[in-house]
From Swiss-Prot:
The lineage of its organism: Bacteria, Pseudomonadati, Pseudomonadota, Gammaproteobacteria, Pseudomonadales. One of its GO terms (molecular function) is ATP binding. SUPFAM superfamilies: HD-domain/PDEase-like. This is Glycine--tRNA ligase beta subunit. Keywords: Aminoacyl-tRNA synthetase, ATP-binding, Cytoplasm, Ligase, Nucleotide-binding, Protein biosynthesis.
């Protein structure tokens, strides 16, 4: 079957840069879906996206649908004809449904059957509907109309190119009649651009100063920004999201170095970086020490004969932004950070849980409780907790919400607070996302845990539990944040006692009955989700959860030990034995003796197992004290041979009551050794 290349390009006014890639990908996916539904084959696909266009190129697309056979089964033969061989209503109805005379129906089989070959349609007749359906299905939050037209799209459309081979696909979509003329750069080449062929699309537009390939523009910007930064003896800050957005703003990227007055460097650099990135889409430069340089890189959409004018224009535009940040910083520093707490008394954290200041006081007390238990200082943690929310009422954070915590750090430093107290004001929000940075100080860790735990207990205490898709207070993230800090920073905190203490801080604001248990279950459920993401089997998690460790660090150490144990050759057999022992002990009548009496042994394998258990117990006790769980399980794995020999030679449920009870006590000792780490029986 013959094939030709297909190109569709929809020209528009400037598309939203932040959604440009997702729109382009959805456009391609829609066309792929349409081609698959029509049974049309092709060899390759490519999507292009620029500020004023979305395009898809399909290589070697079949010129016609394949013919297909359709077989329709009708009523059984005995129901289709009466005793005299005359057709019944069932037969006549089936023929009518098929749109043919009964004589054209196959009557030779057990059922009536109509077979038909449907000829494939020319691809050119199918493409308009496929393209239009794809455009209509784009994920556009809000569509707009323009002029007096009824058509709707994310931006007004300006032109449409649709070529199949060398021919234009005759159609009208979104008020644009298809042709072969695109448009070049708005300033460098405002004239129409004739697209010679689908394969020549990129080169034809390149000649008109348009780089239609999003990834090519992105790479050019990234490489040139890096080169310019190096020339300035700096390193550019290039967040992927900003790079994507800038690549979505320009058709012909030309990065240029600009500068600003050094006096602005007295302002916290995070504020300057935030305003330059978010408002101006600039790439900021850092020196070798990570300090902001008084220079930045802008990406122009034009190759100017006088780039100095573009540079001067950007420097003029950024100055008021930086001046605002400077003003807010100076205004805030006119008073002590602690005085901002007064404003927070009138700011509601949650209607039933009080003000933001109330939360700060709770966090202060909880942080003071946590700090000494993780090796920190209670007084400094309490101080950091009390100051933790102050900057929320500052001018700086009011203008730049991203500065919360960071502004607090600078203001606390200016007030002469201890370094770890100042750092804790920023570290309380860590980790800010999956895989993000953790607190570097114990004071920061204490405040971060306290802040998240206070939110968890408070919101759970008023019954506002997260649902499947709704979690307005980010409780799942809070729980995961607590777990990450404790596990990755190796902080051994008793969560059971800590959560109970946190509950007492709310007084009558919450219903305390069962609250601590509910919060703890939620936290440890997040731990299960964390392990699943890491590829840890649920059975491993459950084997440790059965012991209900109070410390997340202890929990993790046990999980890692069980993971290592599962790789041992004895693991499967010992897991099965533990399950068998667990079942036997659960059926034992009365209480099981705490001690084993060798005088009741009547089999050499009992002596052997007892001796092996005694030796193992002696060996693993110091390991357990040091939480050397992997070593402990590795040592217990040596019990496999005496255990196997015991079960092969010994009947546990002996007729003699004393012998039977003693064997149960022996097995309880065996199981107790493994339960020192995890319930291995759950690994079966």
């Amino acid at each position: 079957m013959s094939a030709q290349d297909f190109l569709v390009e929809l020209g528009t006014e400037e598309l939203p840069p932040k959604t440009l890639v997702s729109l382009a990908d959805a456009f391609l996916a829609g066309i792929e879906k349409g081609l698959a539904g029509a049974g049309l084959t092709y060899s390759a696909k490519q999507v292009y996206a620029a500020p004023r266009r979305l395009a898809v190129l399909i290589t070697a697309l079949a010129t016609q649908q394949p013919d297909r056979s359709v077989n329709l089964d009708g009523p059984p033969r005995q129901a289709a004809f009466d005793a005299d061989g005359n057709p019944t209503q069932a037969a006549l109805g089936f023929a009518k449904k098929c749109g043919v005379d009964l004589s054209e129906i196959d009557q030779s089989g057990p059922k009536l059957r109509y077979s038909q070959t449907i000829l494939g349609k020319p691809t050119t007749s199918l493409l308009p509907t496929i393209v239009e359906d794809s455009l209509n299905d784009l994920p556009i939050a809000k569509r707009m109309r323009w002029g007096a037209r009824k058509e709707e799209f994310v931006r007004p459309t300006q032109w449409l190119v649709m070529l199949f081979g060398d021919q234009v696909v005759d159609c009208t979509i979104l008020a644009q009649s298809a042709g072969r003329h695109s448009r070049g750069h708005r300033f460098h080449h405002p004239e129409d651009v004739r697209i010679s062929s689908p394969a020549g699309y990129l080169s034809d537009l390149r000649a008109a100063n348009v780089l239609a390939d999003f990834n090519e523009r992105r790479q050019i910007i990234s490489k040139r920004v890096e080169e310019l930064a190096s020339q300035q003896e700096g390193t550019a800050i290039v967040p992927p999201s900003l790079l994507d957005e800038v690549a979505g703003l320009v058709e012909w990227p030309v990065p240029l170095v600009c500068s600003f007055e050094e006096r602005f460097l007295d302002v916290p650099q995070e504020a300057l970086i935030t305003t330059m990135q978010d408002n101006q889409k600039y790439f900021c430069l850092l020196d070798a020490d990570g300090k902001l340089l008084p220079r930045f890189i802008t990406v122009a959409n034009i190759e100017s004969k006088d780039p100095a004018q573009i540079i001067a224009g950007n420097e003029k535009v950024v100055r008021p932004r930086l001046t605002d940040a400077e003003f807010f910083f100076k205004q805030d520093k006119k008073q002590k950070l602690e005085t901002f707490n007064d404003r927070l008394k009138n700011v509601v954290f949650q209607a039933q849980l009080g003000s933001v200041f109330d939360k700060a006081e709770r966090v202060s007390k909880l942080a003071a409780y946590i700090a000494p238990r993780i090796g920190g200082d209670a007084q400094r943690a309490a101080r950091a907790g009390l100051l933790s929310k102050c900057d929320l009422s500052s001018e700086m954070v009011g203008e730049f919400p991203e500065m919360q915590g960071i502004a607090g750090y600078y203001y606390a430093k200016a007030d002469g607070e201890a370094e770890d107290v100042a750092l804790a004001l920023n570290e309380q929000y860590m980790p800010r996302g999956a895989g993000a940075e953790l607190p570097t100080t114990l004071t920061g860790a204490a405040v971060a845990i306290a802040d998240k735990l206070d939110t968890l207990v408070g919101i759970f205490g008023i019954g506002m539990l997260p649902t499947g898709s709704k979690d307005p207070y980010a409780l799942r993230r809070a729980a995961l944040g607590i777990l990450r800090i404790l596990i990755e920073k190796k902080l051994d905190l008793n969560l059971v006692e800590t959560v109970k203490f946190a509950v007492t801080q709310f007084g009558a604001k919450v219903k305390p009955a069962g609250l601590a248990e509910q919060v703890l279950e939620f936290i440890f459920d997040r731990l299960r989700a964390r392990y699943e993401d890491e590829g840890v089997e649920v059975a491993v998690y459950l084997s440790v959860r059965a012991l209900q460790p109070a410390s997340a660090l202890d929990f993790d150490q046990r999980v890692q030990a069980v993971q290592a144990f599962r790789k041992l050759p004895q693991a499967a057999a010992l897991a099965a034995v533990n399950k068998r022992v667990s079942n036997l002990l659960s059926k034992a009548e009365g209480s099981i003796a705490q001690t084993v009496e060798p005088k009741y042994f009547d089999n050499a394998n009992e002596f052997s197992l007892y001796s092996a258990i005694q030796q193992a117990d002696h060996a693993v006790q110091p390991m357990a004290a040091e939480r050397q769980y992997s070593e402990s399980l590795a040592r217990l794995a040596m019990l496999r041979e005496p255990v196997d020999a015991f079960f092969e030679a010994v009947m546990v449920n002996a007729e003699d009551a004393n012998v039977r009870a003693n064997r149960y006590a022996l097995l309880a000792r065996l199981r107790g050794l493994f339960l020192g780490v995890a319930d291995i029986s759950l690994l079966g």
